[in-house]
Amino acid sequence: KGCVAIVMLTPLVEEGVNQCARYWPDEGSCTYHNFEIHLVSEHIWCEDYLVRSLYLKHLPSGETRTVTQFHFLSWPNDRVPSTAKPLLELRRKVTKCYKGHNSPVLV
């Protein structure tokens, strides 16, 4: 409840296999189940992750919220990363952005 941050650790497709459903648009808005989702911004912070800002509207209630998605890009398929440095940098970025927030981070 009240989540304003999502950490995504997998690519959408890996070696031709779907890993995760895409629930945000490339640009503009889309409807996904009971939500209208607007891509506000997308920034590549480094080769290991990018950050998206999504504006969500729950269609039945009209409630709106801005959610930040941190998308980790360099987790290798079927194994662990060779170094934890990029993942720790992502963790620091998430912690810095949401320090003091009382809402959960969805991973």
Swiss-Prot record:
PROSITE patterns for this protein: TYR_PHOSPHATASE_PTP
GO cellular component: secretory granule; synapse
Keyword terms of this UniProt record: Hydrolase, Protein phosphatase
Catalyzed reaction equations: O-phospho-L-tyrosyl-[protein] + H2O = L-tyrosyl-[protein] + phosphate
SUPFAM superfamilies: (Phosphotyrosine protein) phosphatases II
Keyword Hydrolase: yes
GO MF annotation list: protein tyrosine phosphatase activity
The protein's Enzyme Commission number: 3.1.3.48
Domain Tyrosine-protein phosphatase as annotated: residue spans: 1-107
GO biological process: one example: regulation of secretion
InterPro entries: IA-2/IA-2_beta, Prot-tyrosine_phosphatase-like, PTP_cat
Family: Belongs to the protein-tyrosine phosphatase family.
Family matches, as PANTHER family: IA-2 PROTEIN TYROSINE PHOSPHATASE, ISOFORM C (PTHR46106:SF4)
Protein name in UniProt: Tyrosine-protein phosphatase 1
Naturally occurring in which organism (per UniProt): Styela plicata (Wrinkled sea squirt)
